[in-house]
Amino acid sequence: MTYLRAQGWDIDLKAHRRRGGHVLGICGGYQMLGNVIDDPEGIEGVIGKTEGLGMLNVNTIMYPKKQLDQVNAMHPPTQQKFTGYEIHIGQTEGADTLRPFAQLNGRNEGAISVDG
């Protein structure tokens, strides 16, 4: 987030969205689209909370255990099925997760904003 803000990308991303553009965040990019990233153990940098971009109503807390799984997945809006790998660190929760981007091995993952 620090580098993204230092380069002015936060301003560009928000302007793109205001003009009707869509933003897709994968992995850490998804976490940065939320309100807050809490890293109490300094796993990804300085210990503490970092303000996200606020494009998704979600908050993330980082945990030291990294998850790596092969998954069977489905994109709920289109019912498109796919397979892949999930590399995951931390837990992201919030109201926008009620509109998941995907279902991985039958559980919801990711979020789609109210405005799509």
PLM feature segments, named:
Residues 70-116:
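C-terminal and late-domain segments of enzyme folds
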